[in-house]
Curated annotation (Swiss-Prot):
InterPro entries: Cyt_c-like_dom (IPR009056), Cyt_c-like_dom_sf (IPR036909), Cyt_c_1A/1B (IPR002327). The modification N6,N6,N6-trimethyllysine is found at K80, K94. Belongs to the cytochrome c family. Pfam families: Cytochrom_C. The keyword Ribonucleoprotein does not apply. The modification N-acetylalanine is found at A1. Heme c binds at C22, C25, H26, M88. This is Cytochrome c. Transmembrane segments: none annotated.
């Protein structure tokens, strides 16, 4: 199912998902450094593999996907299938509601 068919996202639930599943490797804080994964501030509208100062896999650079709701929704289902060769070890979020909630949170927190 695509993002067009996704349930409405709840950013408060998304924040909990981010803290438990993403914050170990990512931050959303403007000006903060990279962790294991790149800083996600300014994520929407950015091309994969282009954040300054982060060492991306060739796969992420070559994919050249523009991050927006639709691409994140598909990516977060199964990152390794969406970008074969990505360094991200996260297995993905299988529930459509979890993906919608996380995207709602990221949209607010990374702007």
């Amino acid at each position: 199912a695509s993002f067009d068919e996704a349930p409405p996202g709840n950013s408060k639930s998304g924040e909990k998902i981010f803290k438990t599943k993403c914050a170990q490797c990512h931050t959303v804080d403007k000006g903060a450094g990279h962790k294991q994964g790149p800083n996600l501030n300014g994520l929407f509208g950015r091309q994969s593999g282009t954040t300054a100062g982060y060492s991306y896999s060739t796969a992420n650079k070559n994919m050249a996907v523009i991050w927006e709701e639709k691409t994140l929704y598909d990516y977060l289902l199964n990152p390794k299938k969406y970008i074969p060769g990505t360094k991200m070890v996260f297995p993905g979020l299988k529930k459509p509601q979890d993906r919608a909630d996380l995207i709602a949170y990221l949209k607010e927190s990374t702007a």
